[in-house]
């Protein structure tokens, strides 16, 4: 599976990125993947390669590029209980500084870059994200409804901007919530907001999961949660994007 590192021009400089894509010589649908707060690392590269194997050109940007290239912070190979507090102390200021205005500006640059790649077929793309990346994915879909056909967020605070964020979303949506992140009552409120905005969506709690359940390099990982993530994400992409 071909992979490469790239530099994406943005309003504030160059964002380094990772890309994985099929080795076919043909053009394929584009997919913008926003990492979780821990950033680009082997587990994200593996997930991008998995998606590329299903026929997509997958672009994974370093959303914290303003603070330096990947790795923005040094991470242990495995983020367990002992390491987590120290890692989070570094990550949270980065998340706090990544404002909605910055996110919208970057999203425009990422989409323009993705759509301009010679390996990417014409037409709308999909956007997926994990943790804070899920919120960035939803912001991207809201800001660019003509360019995003599908959006997925996993263990993501997608409601953080309020229900008005959903008013311009035309993409098909799947949200996979950690059981430890959201109550059934909160899920009902979120789903009613999506309904009211006319969004086509599925939104569910993944049983027995905690925040970060898709990430196999952390103690939050759930093998069953990751399988459900693939079982929901891949059909969404197949329904929403042309065949790769």
PLM feature spans:
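N-terminal cap/leader regions of alpha/beta-hydrolase-fold enzymes
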Residues: 1-244
